[in-house]
Amino acid sequence: MKTTARFGLALASAALASSAAFAQAPASPHTVTANVSLGSEYIFRGISQTAGKPTLQGGFDYAHSSGVYLGTWGSNVSWLEDFGAYNRSSLEWDFYGGYKANFGSSDFFYDLGTIYYYYPGSKNPGVVSADSWELYAALGWKWVSAKLSYSLD
């Protein structure tokens, strides 16, 4: 009888130990993602940025479970050269960060942040830089949102 009890105790201990070995690690509060796309044209706020030509775009994003996020994104553009503003400049490089959270436990959310649009390259004489800062605020529900952006320039 003692042998059976010991065997049962050993079997139960082994079962518990093996289930602990397969336990899932806690989810990280950090998320890093990347994206890339090839498009037929880059249109921003109703204005073509590539004059009807294809676009290659991509970026990296970091998000923390607290709601804080940072990212960078880039795309080819042609409008700087098309309008004679810059020489040999075909890149838009954006840097952004903000805070996004839900209202309580609902599906409604808000997003507050800033974005810097950077256009590297040499400007022609007398041309004002196309680089600009924006502040934005968005309200949304699940997959739909409305966003208001304000340029600081």
Regions found by a protein language model. Give the residues of each.
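Mid-chain, structured segments of secreted extracytoplasmic proteins
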Residues: 73-115
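Cleavable N-terminal export/targeting peptides
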Residues: 1-31
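Repeated loop/turn-to-beta-strand initiation elements of outer-membrane beta-barrel proteins
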Residues: 32, 66-72, 104-110, 143-148
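Residues that define the transmembrane beta-barrel architecture of outer-membrane proteins
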Residues: 30, 52-56, 89-93, 108, ...
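Surface-exposed, well-ordered secondary-structure segments
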Residues: 53, 62-64, 107, 117-123, ...
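Short glycine/proline- and aromatic-enriched beta-strand/turn motifs that initiate or cap beta-hairpins
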Residues: 24-78
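Outer-membrane beta-barrel translocator domains and adjoining extracellular loop/strand segments
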Residues: 44-51, 77-91, 122-130, 151
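Transmembrane beta-strands of outer-membrane beta-barrel pores
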Residues: 38-44, 64, 74-78, 101, ...
